[in-house]
Amino acid sequence: MKPVCLIIGAGAGIGGNVAKKFASEGYHSYLCRRTDEEGLDKLINSITSKGGSASGSLINAIEDNSLEELILDIEKNIGPIEVVVYNLGAQTGMKSLDQTTHKEFEWGWKIASFGLFRVAKVLCPLMEDLSLIHI
């Protein structure tokens, strides 16, 4: 099994380029994004057509257990996750604090902060078992 680089928030910019780089270095790049399955497939094909190993799926990171189930599935069926790129952002626009609603702020927090916490909570013990990290 190849080590896995999990990219959560794999678009055409940073996430996609990180996926390409890790795949070129011998990793299996697993790409996730919330929408645009066609774009995701193009990104995966751009990696595999050059001999890299990649797969991916659409995921809504704020749904309960979505990230946790994804990580456990990858670990079981693809390989050990050695690298995670958490590249999600909440595009709520350039608003001042007084223009940002509570709902918009909460949504951004769920995506950016709470989602990363959930990833770390499930993945850190798995990485620690492989002596990849020390907590």
Which residues does each PLM region occupy?
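Conserved glycine-rich Rossmann-like NAD(P)H-binding loop of the short-chain dehydrogenase/reductase
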Residues: 27-40
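Amphipathic alpha-helical dimer-interface segment in Rossmann-like NAD(P)H-dependent oxidoreductases
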Residues: 111-129
